[in-house]
Design a protein with these regions (language model features):
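Non-globular, low-confidence helical/coil segments that flank catalytic cores
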Residues: 2-6, 28-322
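Alpha-helical interaction segments
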Residues: 21, 225, 235, 327-328
Length: 347
């Protein structure tokens, strides 16, 4: 699994690009290619081995390579949460991936919404792994894949639960907060369960296929949407990731789960352009395979199954370089970036 990270774009530039009323002041650190970023956690490139080889990490978020679908596993202190399971045909891969990590049971299983590319593989996961709680925005749907999801939940002696916005769950020493949906929608994508995951000073936002109407309502709800890492909604479709929403999240990194040469053209150029304007680093499963983000509560690391150039990840980026192999190391307390070779790094 490869490790890479490109230079971070200053938070004030991202805010200005999104036309905020005021710019934030930005200082400079005393190290080559360093900067001060207010209120931001910053990544470090890890040389660690891939997950699933016996390593122990305090917190990891895995974006599985399920093609034109979504499946995210969150691990903290030996507890696990599965958010979506890809398509039905992805079920065996999801189970194998979790087995290789040593997963024996799941504390929480979330179906973000009732479309097959999110709920389909959860039946296989529930057939193999015992779960404590299973959640979905609905308890009934007409599709066989959703009915199977309900069946395998009930075979464990559980019922599919419909959680409410504002619910908070512990996951080890991390917290998971349900932010949305905050209204009723006819559009199934907008019913997606939106979760904020906090571990120390690092934060992550899972949005399923939420589109612009639900994004607007979520912003207007006053929920705390600021996050370091954003799962870009609806596989990078132009129907999601509106300016108003991205303005509220201001992520350092956007993860897009989509299939190679998929028929929908995801991610759409409109979405890539918005992310580019905001200075968000884009990571895509169609180019990078599985993506693993680790956190020690202050810094986060990125590991990818494959490598790709910046120009491939966000292809119209005029400033894209050949490859992004060197990273920046940062600390949310000092708010400073350092090159890995910087002599001013703490021991």
């Amino acid at each position: 699994m490869e490790n890479f990270k490109k230079e971070k774009v200053s938070l004030w530039r991202r805010i200005a690009a999104l036309a905020l009323a005021a710019a934030l002041a930005l200082g400079l650190a005393a190290c080559d290619a360093s900067a001060v970023v207010p209120g931001s956690s910053t990544p470090t490139v890890s040389t660690a081995q891939p997950a699933g080889d016996g390593q122990t990490a305090n917190f990891e978020m895995h974006f599985l390579d399920v093609g034109q679908a979504l499946s995210v596993l969150v691990e903290c202190d030996g507890q696990y949460m599965l958010y979506d399971g890809g398509n039905v045909d992805d079920g065996s891969y999801v189970v194998s991936y979790l087995q290789n990590l040593g997963v024996e049971e799941l504390q929480y299983v979330f179906c973000s919404h009732a479309h097959e590319d999110h709920v389909g593989g959860l039946s296989a996961a529930l057939a193999y792994f015992p779960a404590d709680h299973v959640y979905s925005p609905v308890t009934e749907a007409s599709t066989k894949c959703f009915q199977d999801f309900v069946k395998y939940t009930q075979q464990q002696g559980l019922q599919v639960e419909v959680p409410a916005a504002g619910t908070v769950w512990p996951l080890g020493s991390a917290t998971v907060t349900m932010l949305g949906p905050v209204a009723q929608y006819d559009n199934t994508n907008d019913t997606s369960i939106v979760l904020r995951v906090d571990y120390g000073s690092t934060s992550f936002l899972l949005t399923g296929d939420m589109e612009s109407d639900a994004e607007r309502d979520l912003v207007n709800s006053g929920a705390n949407l600021k996050a370091d890492v954003l799962q870009v909604g609806h596989h990078g479709s132009s129907t999601s990731t509106s300016y108003i929403f991205l303005n509220a999240v201001l992520p350092e990194m956007g993860i897009i789960s989509c299939g190679v040469n998929n028929k929908y053209g995801h991610p759409h150029e409109e979405t890539l352009s918005i992310l580019r304007d905001a200075g968000v680093d884009v990571y895509r499963t169609d180019l990078l395979g599985a993506i693993v983000i680790g956190s020690d509560g202050q810094n986060y690391t990125i590991r990818t199954e494959k490598t790709a150039t910046d120009a491939e990840l966000n292809p119209t980026d005029p400033a894209a370089s050949s490859t992004a192999q060197q990273g920046y190391i940062g600390n949310v307390n000092s708010k400073k970036f350092h090159l890995p070779t910087c002599p001013n790094l703490p021991a």
